[in-house]
């Protein structure tokens, strides 16, 4: 009878997949750290491998080149943005919307490192059509998620109106992040959030 301590092929496959995903996330964390610290010019396969503490050969196993590496990092940031506007079970729609509007000005999103990273990633849009496409897709995905929250909080709104409000809020939020890189003004940030609430919850 086989020992319980022996891993089945399926268990080994799951463990291998988990390790692979962890390594890739470790590498993407390193890409974002290098981008925030050194800008796009500082990103290389070797620099990211050093930051991640992995062998260069492992980098090349997961990512073909610098472009694919940065593209993956952009997509990851887009996923994180989308999570900010995901509906949360158990909360009234209005509260979900208000919480989402406040989450974007949490300390983690107003730190110097994060704002520098955000600026670097946005600056990639004119550099390469692939980066532009990923950036645009991420912005649209966030905007559409926000429009859904607006619609849930105000069911009487036409879909077009909810979408327009989400688009207007996105402009304010992006401007907030950019300005916060240059001027640390908490009062202005709080007013901007209140303005977003007014846009979202207008009758």
What are these language model-derived features?
Residues 1-22, 33:
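N-terminal intrinsically disordered/low-complexity leader segments
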Residues 26, 30-68, 72:
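Helix-turn-helix
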Residues 39, 124-129:
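Short loop-to-helix capping motifs
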Residues 75-81:
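Short, basic, alpha-helical segments at the C-terminal edge of helix-turn-helix-like DNA-binding modules
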